Amino acid sequence: MCPDQEIQTEEVSARFEEGKNQTIIDRKRGLLWLKYDTWQLSGKWLNWVQSREFSEELNQQKFGGYSDWRLPTVSEAKSLFDKKQQNKDHMGQTISHAAIFEPGFGFLCWTSDVRNKIQAVRFGFRKGLQIFDDIYRTSRGSTRLVRDIEKNDGLL
């Protein structure tokens, strides 16, 4: 391992940590991510509306011990895009995404950012681009749910 790779690995391991109950702790941003995206958890593609409903279902179940899972903002989703790291999407393609997350996720991630009540932003992990898409479009729709870490969680 070259010195640059060692530094990058240390930065990543300082930022992310495996949490309990299928979660990943993001120390840099104060977030708790689900290790699996909605495609991996449900086995089906979801549009934006269904993604929000899915988060509500997990909240009712207190998935991972929490009831405040939500769609990420564009900024939060984009923060997982990292050209220094590699992971595999659902098609087995190598993408620039934090490697601590379980491989096999959807490469397009719905976010909470909306426009005109009919479009939402999807962040693409293959090229690191964001696009507006119809909130009812299901094509390869998935998201990685997230929550803010609270002081009383004892995770930071």
Protein language model regions, located:
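Glycine-aromatic-enriched surface loops/turns that form tight recognition elements
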Residues: 1-70, 75-156
